[in-house]
């Protein structure tokens, strides 16, 4: 080997020794794979599905100002939304804190120290008062001020990976806020339409009670005239008492719903003063296929996906910790034993330092941190895969229930039409003078009972359709 090639080899030897001396990274179990990663799914809907798909503000489709106002109040004032917002701000602040570690830092410092030197210590000569020797002891007033700078070189990408992990957490928290928003809106809408269903049922029950009172009045008149016995009107009295009990139950349910709406909307007044409105008509506009290709529109799956991405970046940061850390430091200062000399040019001092930290033996600490990062990542992936399967099942169950209730409502509508025809025939016979007016009331009561059953089915369909909207992501777009 000639001299020209010998010196470069000697110069590279410390670098090779540094890399070879790093703590060894052991093999770990294989990472889990994501089931339909949400980031790879297009959120744009096929043209055939756009008309029947929920919008991000799907509740506006009901064209109900009361409902819109309740949901807006919930989104603005609900504690759950405030918690979600603060979680985002915390994640953003943590991401900024990690990002600042990747740049240079410059500090200014100044200090002054008054001290007496010991004549018997290491600095004993400075305790003497000998101007010729440059000592004016034993008292000195030392002063220092200047700039110090430092820069941690992120050669292996450790800080960049940590920043990416934090940003993934920020995106996950934002998706969680949207999920909270959709859950709140869905809860308010379901309670609101349940209240409207009970209000409509209350109206029908009052009509039934009115018809029953008509029959009771007729039976009493017949009994007073000696035409019927006292036993003939007992069944009608019992039915009227049951109707009154149902009215009391409905009133109690409405009060409970109002209390729950007050809690969700953080309403401070005693009463919401809701006004009854007609229930929306039953309709079915479901997409033909509800599969994995549409799951990216669910905020909870987006949040789970970003937690997975964050965990993968955490693994990269844990791997980068096995390699050397390189730090650059510099200072430019004024330093003097006496304050009178502090601002002289001769009191200036400066320097540059390059530091290297090489992990060689760490008792397995770095490998343990890497194992933890990989285990947490696998847990995030497993949780994501579980959420995907549950999301598909949620959509399938909700869609099936909506379709079943839509069919039940159609059958119930036919039953109500048949019952109304019976009422029409009784009314015609009454108009012809064939039967008494109480017989018309007797014909109306079964029809009103069927109307009550229809309202309950209609309310169940509304509740199921709102739950399906939530299962479909509520129109969320990342």
Swiss-Prot record:
- Residues with lipid group (S-diacylglycerol cysteine): 22
PROSITE patterns named among the record's database cross-references: PROKAR_LIPOPROTEIN
Residues with a covalently attached lipid (N-palmitoyl cysteine): 22
Regarding the membrane, this protein is recorded as: Lipid-anchor
Arranged from A to Z, the UniProt key words for this protein are:
Antibiotic resistance, Cell outer membrane, Lipoprotein, Membrane, Palmitate, Signal, Transmembrane, Transmembrane beta strand
Q: Which domain of life is it from?
A: Bacteria
Could you tell me where this protein is found in the cell? Cell outer membrane
The UniProt GO MF terms for this protein read: efflux transmembrane transporter activity
Q: Which residues form the signal peptide?
A: 1-21
Q: Which GO terms describe its biological process?
A: response to antibiotic
Question: Which cysteines in this chain are paired by disulphide bridges?
Answer: none
Any single Gene Ontology cellular-component annotation:
cell outer membrane
PANTHER family to which the protein is assigned, alphabetical:
MULTIDRUG RESISTANCE OUTER MEMBRANE PROTEIN MDTP-RELATED (PTHR30203:SF20), OUTER MEMBRANE CATION EFFLUX PROTEIN (PTHR30203)
Q: What does this protein do?
A: Could be involved in resistance to puromycin, acriflavine and tetraphenylarsonium chloride.
Q: Which family does it belong to?
A: Belongs to the outer membrane factor (OMF) (TC 1.B.17) family.
Protein name per the record: Putative multidrug resistance outer membrane protein MdtQ
Biological source species: Shigella flexneri
């Amino acid at each position: 080997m000639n001299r020209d090639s010998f010196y470069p080899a000697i110069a590279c030897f410390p670098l090779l020794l540094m890399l070879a001396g790093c703590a060894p990274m052991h093999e770990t179990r294989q990472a889990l794979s994501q089931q339909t990663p949400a980031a790879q799914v297009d959120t744009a809907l096929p043209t055939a599905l756009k008309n029947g798909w929920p919008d991000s503000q799907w509740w506006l489709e009901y064209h109900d100002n009361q409902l819109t106002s309740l949901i807006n109040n919930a989104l603005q004032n609900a504690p759950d939304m405030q918690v979600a917002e603060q979680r985002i701000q915390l994640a953003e602040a943590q991401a900024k804190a990690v990002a600042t570690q990747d740049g240079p830092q410059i500090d200014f410092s100044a200090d002054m120290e008054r001290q007496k030197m010991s004549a018997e210590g290491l600095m004993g000569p400075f305790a003497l008062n000998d101007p010729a020797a440059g000592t004016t002891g034993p008292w000195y007033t030392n002063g220092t001020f200047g700039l110090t700078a430092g820069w941690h070189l992120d050669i292996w990408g450790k800080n960049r990976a940590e920043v990416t992990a934090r940003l993934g957490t920020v995106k996950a928290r934002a998706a969680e806020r949207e999920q909270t928003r959709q859950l709140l809106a869905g809860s308010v809408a379901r309670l609101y339409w349940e209240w409207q269903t009970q209000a409509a049922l209350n109206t029908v029950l009052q009509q039934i009670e009115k018809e029953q009172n008509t029959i009771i009045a007729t039976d009493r008149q017949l009994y007073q005239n000696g035409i019927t016995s006292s036993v003939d009107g007992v069944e009608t009295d019992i039915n009227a008492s049951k109707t009154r009990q149902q009215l009391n139950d409905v009133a109690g349910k409405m009060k409970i719903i109002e209390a729950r709406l007050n809690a969700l909307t953080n309403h401070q007044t005693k009463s919401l003063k809701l006004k009854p409105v007609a229930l929306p008509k039953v309709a079915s506009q479901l997409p033909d296929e509800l599969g994995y290709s549409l799951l990216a529109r669910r905020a909870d799956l987006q949040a789970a996906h970003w937690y997975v991405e964050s965990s993968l970046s955490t693994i990269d940061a844990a791997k980068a910790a096995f390699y050397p850390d390189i730090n650059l430091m510099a200072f430019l200062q004024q330093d003097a034993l006496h304050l009178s000399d502090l601002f002289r040019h001769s009191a200036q001092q400066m320097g540059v330092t390059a530091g290297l930290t090489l992990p060689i033996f760490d008792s397995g600490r770095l490998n343990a941190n890497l194992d933890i990062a990989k285990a947490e990542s696998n847990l995030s992936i497993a949780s994501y895969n579980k959420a995907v399967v549950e999301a598909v099942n949620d959509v399938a169950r909700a869609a099936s229930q909506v379709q079943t209730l839509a069919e039940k409502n159609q059958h119930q509508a036919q039953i109500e039409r048949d019952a109304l025809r019976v009422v029409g025939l009784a009314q015609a016979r009454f108009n012809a003078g064939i039967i008494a007016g109480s017989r018309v009331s007797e014909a109306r009561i079964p029809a009103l009972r069927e109307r009550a059953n229809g309202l309950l089915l209609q309310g169940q369909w509304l509740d199921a359709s709102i739950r399906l909207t939530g299962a479909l992501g509520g129109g969320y777009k990342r």
